Amino acid sequence: MTLKDIPFWRVLLIFQTARVYAGFGDPREAITMIHQQHGKPCDCAGGYVNAAPTVYLAAVSCSSHTAYQPSDSLKWRCVSNPTLANGENIGNCPCKTFKESVHSSCYTAYQECFFGNKTYYTAILASNRAPTIGTSNVPTVLGNTHNLLSAGCTGNVGQPICWNPKAPVHISDGGGPQDKAREIAVQKRLEEIHKSLFPELRYHPLALPKARGKEKIDAQTFNLLTATYSLLNKSNPNLANECWLCLPSGNPIPLAIPSNDSFLGSNLSCPIIPPLLVQPLEFMNLINASCFYSPFQNNSFDVDVGLVEFANCSTTLNISHSLCAPNSSVFVCGNNKAYTYLPSNWTGTCVLATLLPDIDIVPGDAPVPVPAIDHYLHRARRAVQFIPLLVGLGITTAVSTGTAGLGYSITQYTKLSRQLISDVQAISSTIQDLQDQVDSLAEVVLQNRRGLDLLTAEQGGICLALQEKCCFYANKSGIVRDKIKRLQEDLEKRRKEIIDNPFWTGLHGLLPYLLPLLGPLFCLLLLITFGPLIFNKIITFVKQQIDAIQAKPIQVHYHRLEQEDNGGVYLRVS
């Protein structure tokens, strides 16, 4: 049978047939919706809580806090890490026994103390917690050397507890001071290796960002934005037609997605950077996750990078030598720290990942809160809906099927990852400089009583400040540098028109503040003017009704009873 022999209506029916998924819709769209609504781990969409959840699926360190994904919710909940209390040294330790490690969820603040010429940590115990084996609070089978031992805390609640400042190998205190000390030790060791390999000491942007003027954007930041937009334009041109690319202020935490690159680079030309904090995503959804494991030798030369607690390692490769990540990838290890190089004496568990910048997208047709006359009318501003970069690129629907499922060439993602590895710290300083300008402008805003949300500089606008993010406008031609400047000019034009209008400048500039009160005042005036008249009308009407009821005669209807004389005999007694 040929195509000509098939009736036309059958061919039309075949092309009109839609794909169904057992009546539940496309599961990839559900994954995209979950990421868009619940955000990234460090966004803390589930809010901050006082204690870590009893059972959680994954934990991600976010510098000042730790994000947990509980089993009863898809939103990440965050717990602030303990801080060093005021008066960091209290002298002699108030304890007679000292523990090896104490989990950070068991106290809120800690101090240093001394005992026997040694330094220890001490805190007031707030709760008890049993130590666990595994990647979460759910214990796994003992004997698995790849599992992470999470420290516990036992004692009398409300009493002081003391412990060593250095934790044993492969034991985590949940982002507390012991984990911080481990990270500092690893960073110092990598810096020593870097100095031995490069005696002339070439400063990496991660270690020393370039100096630049406060009013100018750094070249690395602009190049990263351009590369991100180019990738977005090729993978999702409809979204990239007109949009805002928003970078968070402060220290950026790049996104880490699984990488299937099995080729490891040569150690001779391996770039060495300090540990980089990242946000691992999609590792829990990955079916076949390959991990690298190096056992510890139980000596002082071990470089403990920790064990991953955000991935299900289905395959574990035992490593006994140094490792160099491919040019566009990193090793993500314990406390979600990323490394490009692992020395020969490293110990822990790591996964290979590709980095993407922590950029959110605002569609061009979405209203952004640019201040204008709305400020004077005191209109409530609508919240800006940000689209995560992974959703915009379509990565959330493809990672679970492997890199072959990515819509665009994987080489483009690796190029962006390679550039991000080199420039992330320079970008951090740039956005921090811009945030400093926003903070300094806040005082001007309060003094001039104007809602100035646009970031201004001597040479023109840089970015639009939206919810602690620095947003850059882009269209078909790429990143538009003068977009904010044009918005500022339009805004200034509107303000001049308002200032020149005597209606707004009356009463020595107090009229804009009196306008919100005009409505209630007008209603009150109407009530005072017409209120008594309406009240008298109501009283008169009620009185008339009562008088009418009282004046109306009461009619009683009755019938006269009939009398019958039967002519009976009566006995009369005298």
Swiss-Prot record:
Motif (CXXC): 243-246
Side of membrane Extracellular, spans: 23-514
Signal peptide as annotated in the record: 1-22
The keyword Transmembrane is assigned to this record: yes
Keywords: Cleavage on pair of basic residues, Coiled coil, Disulfide bond, Fusion of virus membrane with host cell membrane, Fusion of virus membrane with host membrane, Glycoprotein, Host cell membrane, Host membrane, Host-virus interaction, Membrane, Signal, Transmembrane, Transmembrane helix, Viral attachment to host cell, Viral envelope protein, Viral penetration into host cytoplasm, Virion, Virus entry into host cell
Residues that span the membrane, as ranges: 515-535
Glycosylation sites: N117, N233, N260, N267, N288, N298, N312, N318, N327, N345, N475
Disulphide-bonded residues: C243-C246, C243-C471, C463-C470
Cytoplasmic topology ranges: 536-574
PTM comment, free text: Specific enzymatic cleavages in vivo yield mature proteins. Envelope glycoproteins are synthesized as an inactive precursor that is N-glycosylated and processed likely by host cell furin or by a furin-like protease in the Golgi to yield the mature SU and TM proteins. The cleavage site between SU and TM requires the minimal sequence [KR]-X-[KR]-R. The R-peptide is released from the C-terminus of the cytoplasmic tail of the TM protein upon particle formation as a result of proteolytic cleavage by the viral protease. Cleavage of this peptide is required for TM to become fusogenic.
GO biological process, one term: symbiont entry into host cell
Sites annotated Cleavage: R382, A383, V556, H557
Region (Immunosuppression) location: 446-462
GO cellular component terms, A-Z: host cell plasma membrane; membrane; viral envelope; virion membrane
Motif (CX6CC): 463-471
Described purpose of this protein according to its UniProt entry: The surface protein (SU) attaches the virus to the host cell by binding to its receptor. This interaction triggers the refolding of the transmembrane protein (TM) and is thought to activate its fusogenic potential by unmasking its fusion peptide. Fusion occurs at the host cell plasma membrane. The transmembrane protein (TM) acts as a class I viral fusion protein. Under the current model, the protein has at least 3 conformational states: pre-fusion native state, pre-hairpin intermediate state, and post-fusion hairpin state. During viral and target cell membrane fusion, the coiled coil regions (heptad repeats) assume a trimer-of-hairpins structure, positioning the fusion peptide in close proximity to the C-terminal region of the ectodomain. The formation of this structure appears to drive apposition and subsequent fusion of viral and target cell membranes.
Annotated protein name in UniProt: Envelope glycoprotein
Organism name: Simian retrovirus SRV-2
